[in-house]
């Protein structure tokens, strides 16, 4: 809090006083505005340069570098801008789950879990949401965004309790990137990758 998303110098000074799982002096820092707060993402310089070299060796143009979840979250905020309540973002991919609970555009809870047991995961998610709402002064109606593939969606959509006033805000994205298959092979984007690419596309307009 109290930082501007464009003030990298102030952010580095503030982060220097924190216990961090990375070496600040050897990392690139990216800042994003989140509902009046600032999200900081760091990545080692050597790792970034290694990926730049990979792109260069493939003779592909590199226009920008971004973090998948950070970009996807920006897309999420764009698409749910009209929602006034609290926001639940549920990500399920290859047996792994992630629950991110937002209030006022700020992610307050970020919890990863195994999603192999759907019923058990439903119970865990409800417990986490209940505990979170118990800490809030005035819990708001819940809106859900489900970043889940179509084949898994039927197992998870029931977690949204419409009878309790909850709403499923998930929608089909209006833009998709063109597939590139130089070697005759293409793979569909996961929902969170699609959301991130959608955000980057919108920001380029």
Enumerate the predicted regions with their spans:
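Hydrophobic/aromatic-enriched cytosolic interaction surfaces used to assemble or bind macromolecules
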Residues: 1-205
């Amino acid at each position: 809090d109290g930082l501007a998303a464009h003030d990298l110098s102030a952010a580095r000074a503030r982060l220097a006083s924190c216990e961090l799982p990375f070496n600040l002096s050897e990392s690139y820092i990216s800042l994003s505005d989140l509902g009046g707060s600032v999200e900081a993402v760091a990545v080692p310089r050597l790792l970034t340069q290694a990926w730049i070299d990979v792109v260069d060796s493939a003779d592909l143009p590199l226009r920008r570098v971004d973090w998948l979840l950070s970009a996807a979250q920006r897309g999420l905020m764009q698409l749910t801008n009209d929602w006034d309540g609290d926001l639940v973002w549920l990500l399920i991919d290859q047996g792994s789950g992630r629950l991110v609970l937002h209030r006022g555009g700020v992610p307050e809870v970020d919890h990863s879990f195994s999603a192999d047991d759907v019923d058990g995961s439903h119970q865990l998610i409800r417990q986490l949401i209940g505990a979170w709402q118990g800490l809030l002064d005035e819990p708001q109606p819940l809106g859900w965004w489900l970043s889940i593939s179509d084949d898994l969606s039927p197992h998870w959509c029931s977690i949204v309790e419409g009878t309790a006033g909850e709403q499923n805000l998930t929608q089909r994205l209006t833009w998709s990137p063109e597939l590139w298959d130089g070697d005759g092979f293409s793979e569909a984007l996961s929902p969170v990758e699609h959301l991130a690419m959608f955000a980057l596309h919108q920001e380029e307009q």
